[in-house]
Curated annotation (Swiss-Prot):
The keyword Transcription regulation applies. Residues 21-40 bind DNA. Residues 2-63 form the HTH asnC-type domain. It comes from Zymomonas mobilis subsp. mobilis (strain ATCC 10988 / DSM 424 / LMG 404 / NCIMB 8938 / NRRL B-806 / ZM1). GO terms for cellular component: cytosol. This is HTH-type transcriptional regulator Zrp. GO terms for molecular function: sequence-specific DNA binding. It comes from the Bacteria. Keywords: DNA-binding, Transcription, Transcription regulation. It holds the Pfam family HTH_24. One of its GO terms (biological process) is response to amino acid. The keyword Transcription regulation applies.
């Protein structure tokens, strides 16, 4: 059972995964050992899936974001497996979501520049055919947050 302290721990770790356990314990009013047990349980139960380093996209030369809307035309199991494998194999495709509506998927690409989109486009087409694709260049990132709200658990 998740309580308010667990939610607070999850929020603190999302804000700073390197926060010392002693500081987390102090903020949630627990002993370090009790806090450590809670963090271990949250990991064990799958609430914490892992810890990653968030990189500065400009510093690693991936400042361009392009969203690609895709209509597949086919919805057979074999085609969808091929599609999922193809997009999973391209590291510049950082998110893929299946949609309702006029398009089947939206892909988020992290690229060094707009011109590099053509390279990715051709890579995708080598593996799967599409009915339609539309690309949209992000002009500005207004909000980006990997942190999820914890008040729903």
């Amino acid at each position: 059972m998740i309580d308010y302290r667990d939610r607070h721990i999850l929020s603190l770790l999302q804000a700073n995964a390197e926060m010392p356990l002693a500081e987390i314990a102090e903020r949630v009013a627990l002993s370090v050992s009790a806090c450590s047990r809670r963090v271990a349980r949250l990991r064990e139960e799958g609430y914490i899936k892992g810890t990653i380093a968030l990189l500065d996209r400009k510093k690693i030369n991936l400042p361009t974001t392009i969203f690609l809307l895709v209509k597949t035309g086919l919805h057979t199991g074999n085609y969808l497996e091929q599609f999922h494998a193809a997009v999973s194999a391209i590291p510049e495709i950082v998110e893929v979501h299946r949609l309702t509506g006029n398009f089947d998927y939206i892909l988020k690409l992290a690229l060094p520049n707009v011109e590099y989109y053509d390279v990715i486009y051709k890579q995708i087409l080598k593996h799967v055919a599409f009915y339609d694709m539309s690309a949209y260049i992000s002009m500005e990132t207004v909000k980006i947050s990997p942190a999820l709200p914890t008040n729903y658990i």
